[in-house]
Amino acid sequence: MAPITGSNFHLHLVSDSTGETLITVSRAVVAQYANVTPVEHVYPLVRSQKQLDRVLAEIEEEPGIVLFTLLEKDLVERLEAKCQEINSPSLSIIGPVMQLFQAYLGAATIGRVGAQHTLNADYFRRIDALNYTMMHDDGQHVEGLEEADVVLVGVSRTSKTPTSIYLANRGIRTANVPLVPGIAIPRQLESLRTPLVVSLHAAPERLIQVRQNRLLSIGTRAGNDTYIDRQSVADEVTYARRLSAKHDWVQLDVTRRSIEETAAAIMKLFADRQRQRQPE
């Protein structure tokens, strides 16, 4: 198949489950290509020939790359045959990985659709973490901070809330507390013994940019607001760094990090800490 010209193309994601795996993998790959914008077509819960018929009709109407996570052999064969017929490249995202596992383990798969979404202990742990995190967002209910796995602190717009939610989705109970010059931090934060406290920092220039975008999004004129004043923001950052050093909190610069990268760094810190605390 000859490569397409231009920056836009159709990307068809066909799944017999939620489609989350396909979305995550495809977006990670697309991010490696500059000026490329796929038109995503997501087809979740495709589990019958009739459902697949509708998907194939749409793919034929707007051909492009087809990625899929289907376990039913008949569905896979039909999808691949149709893609070959219309000259659309197709690839099973989990097929090669399953083959590798099967060869190494010498065991067949259970073939259960959506097995990763089973209501097991991990699922309920994530739900519990999400409930806790939502209840302890932005300095709420500080009396329960000791029950957290991780407590994030930082000045405004250091991605505390989205990072907290991301961690909660990984089963990590996360609270976050804003650091504001002139306002004392909660006494509970100063006396924590169990949670990992991580202080998020960003360069003043980055904070100003994010804050300006925030003001624009809510239709507020900045004026001479200290919220985006260069010196005021620099003073905030200095205050947060000094306070973090005083309390020996882990400090993490998020200036050039995405939410996912920040969360990954925190998860590693948390895992390392858990291992250190385990008795030998």
From Swiss-Prot:
Alphabetical list of InterPro entries matching this protein: Kinase-pyrophosphorylase (IPR005177), PPDK_reg (IPR026565)
Listed EC numbers: 2.7.11.32, 2.7.4.27
Pfam families per the UniProt record, alphabetical: Kinase-PPPase
Binding-site residues, ADP: 154-161
Domain of life: Bacteria
MF annotations from Gene Ontology: ADP binding; ATP binding; phosphotransferase activity, phosphate group as acceptor; protein serine/threonine kinase activity
NCBIfam families per record: PRK05339.1
Known function: Bifunctional serine/threonine kinase and phosphorylase involved in the regulation of the pyruvate, phosphate dikinase (PPDK) by catalyzing its phosphorylation/dephosphorylation.
Protein's UniProt name: Putative pyruvate, phosphate dikinase regulatory protein
